[in-house]
Amino acid sequence: MGTPCHFALFDLQPCFRLDLDKLATRYRELAREVHPDRFADASEREQRVALEKSAALNDAYQTLRSAPRRARYLLAIGGHEVPQEVTVHDPDFLLQQMQWREELEELQDEADLDGVAVFKKRLKAAQEQLNEDFAACWDVPAERDKAERLMRRMQFLDKLAQEVRQLEERLDD
């Protein structure tokens, strides 16, 4: 028995654009059904199955609620496995990455919380644009390489967004 499709667990068709509020609501409903505590008096086998179902549900939810992880997953179930670590041959984006990192470093050095807020808005807009671009091409076989490039960019911006949140917390203290 293979692992069920993450989308199928939530009664969804594979697609990139998801209503994350509905996904969260459905997750909570399903989590209550398979929570291991509900099987405390069940047999050891039933407890193990409940634990496995709960873990699979958690993994599926974490994957689907994250745009970069959802993008990678969609490519994988479409037969386009993307290695985790690969050299990026995208000079324009590499230059953009360097510029963003330098700007973030300057904001940190200057302890510029307002500047960080502006940077965060620009980053969010860039993420939204990548999400739209990916949504338009992920299921077009001729555009799978483009979709992979976009997914890698999404991963970078997601990591950068985490760094921005951490910087905000440090500057806010």
From Swiss-Prot:
The keyword Chaperone applies. Pfam families: DnaJ, HSCB_C. One of its GO terms (biological process) is [2Fe-2S] cluster assembly. One of its GO terms (cellular component) is iron-sulfur cluster transfer complex. One of its GO terms (molecular function) is ATPase activator activity. Residues 5-77 form the J domain. InterPro entries: DnaJ_domain (IPR001623), HscB (IPR004640), HscB_C_sf (IPR036386), HscB_oligo_C (IPR009073), J_dom_sf (IPR036869). Keywords: Chaperone. It comes from the Bacteria. Belongs to the HscB family. Interacts with HscA and stimulates its ATPase activity. Co-chaperone involved in the maturation of iron-sulfur cluster-containing proteins. Seems to help targeting proteins to be folded toward HscA. This is Co-chaperone protein HscB homolog. It comes from Pseudomonas putida (strain W619). The gene is hscB.
